[in-house]
Swiss-Prot record:
It comes from Conus consors. Keywords: Disulfide bond, Ion channel impairing toxin, Neurotoxin, Pyrrolidone carboxylic acid, Secreted, Toxin, Voltage-gated sodium channel impairing toxin. The modification Pyrrolidone carboxylic acid is found at Q1. Expressed by the venom duct. This is Mu-conotoxin CnIIIB.
Length: 25
């Protein structure tokens, strides 16, 4: 669980599921 905190992780498997979270950055 580092998607929200690290933009570099936004395209990893679990972050693709949480794309909303990454877009908020």
């Amino acid at each position: 669980q580092g998607c929200c905190g690290e933009p570099n992780l936004c395209f990893t498997r679990w972050c693709r599921n949480n794309a909303r979270c990454c877009r908020q950055q």
